[in-house]
């Protein structure tokens, strides 16, 4: 069948972006709105939810997506205000250092709830609406490069992100008969407000040494991949994790030597 340029558009489709008040989530929400979607932002910080919703002309809901009751309430409100949801982006997440020998049970649970539990809750609830309405749709989860490589000091976070990747594959198979596609995005270094707040001076240049494309990513580049996965142009893609990382995952430890610029592997 011939390609139709309008297939990239999301006109009048209802999209939910969790954790859409800042960073990658806000970039995706902004991108969806630019391509015609009606966007609902589910965000546990009320002020950023409101600000992001105003920017994209959408609906901002103060929601803790780790809580099933709040997810149910947010979904009911979204459907009532905007209509049935056909796009979901599970973007909410969090990370802190958690060395294996020092991680408490509470710490492990916190990282699980922040990075995996909400993916299960939101995917299940939104998919039920899609199935009941017979509308199909696209579900996209934001995982991380840490989901496919070792992450010393971040075992709990990496395990949760790996769980997102496998859950994506399994959910894709279970939901395929209903016309629901399930995919994931795996960023690496992406310039967000949070990264810029904690990064030392000159970090941008150092980040560039580890990325084959020579620079960190931008939230709008994550949004571009999300728009593609949400749109009709990706109608035969499901169960996949796309690494939007400038080539870092493919590099497998190769990096630009800071003095010569030549690719090197490990210490030199």
Where are these regions (language model features)?
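Conserved glycine-rich cofactor-binding loop
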Residues: 14, 21-23
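Substrate-binding pocket helix/loop in short-chain dehydrogenase/reductase
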Residues: 99-100, 107-112, 207
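Active-site loop immediately N-terminal to the catalytic Tyr-X3-Lys motif
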Residues: 101, 149-155, 177, 214, ...
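C-terminal helical subdomain
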Residues: 105, 184, 205-237, 244-246, ...
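Active-site helix of classical SDR
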Residues: 123, 160, 168
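Alpha-helical segment proximal to the catalytic Tyr-Lys
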Residues: 128, 173-177, 235
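Residue(s) in the substrate-gating loop at a strand-loop-helix junction
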Residues: 144
């Amino acid at each position: 069948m011939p390609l139709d340029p309008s297939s990239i558009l999301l006109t009048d489709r209802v999209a939910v972006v969790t954790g859409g008040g800042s960073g990658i989530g806000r970039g995706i929400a902004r991108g969806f709105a630019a391509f015609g979607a009606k966007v609902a932002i589910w965000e546990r910080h009320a002020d950023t939810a409101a600000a992001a919703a105003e920017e994209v002309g959408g609906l901002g809901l103060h929601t803790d997506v780790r809580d099933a009751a709040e997810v149910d309430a947010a979904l009911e409100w979204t459907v009532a205000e905007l209509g049935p949801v056909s796009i979901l982006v599970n973007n909410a997440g969090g990370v802190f250092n958690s060395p294996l020998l020092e991680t408490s049970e509470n710490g492990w649970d916190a990282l699980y709830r922040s990075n995996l539990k909400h993916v299960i809750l939101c995917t299940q609830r939104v998919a039920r609406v899609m199935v009941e309405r017979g509308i199909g749709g696209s579900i996209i989860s934001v995982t991380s490069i840490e989901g496919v490589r070792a992450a010393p000091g971040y075992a709990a976070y990496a395990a949760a992100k790996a769980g997102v990747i496998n859950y994506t594959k399994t959910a894709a198979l279970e939901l395929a008969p209903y016309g629901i596609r399930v995919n994931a995005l795996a960023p690496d270094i992406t310039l967000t407000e949070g990264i810029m707040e904690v990064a030392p001076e000159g970090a941008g240049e150092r980040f560039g040494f580890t990325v084959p494309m020579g620079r960190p990513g931008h939230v709008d580049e994550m949004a571009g991949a999300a728009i593609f996965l949400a749109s009709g142009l990706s109608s035969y893609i499901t169960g996949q994790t796309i690494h939007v990382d400038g080539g870092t995952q493919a590099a497998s430890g190769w990096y630009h030597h800071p003095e010569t610029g030549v690719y090197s592997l490990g210490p030199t």
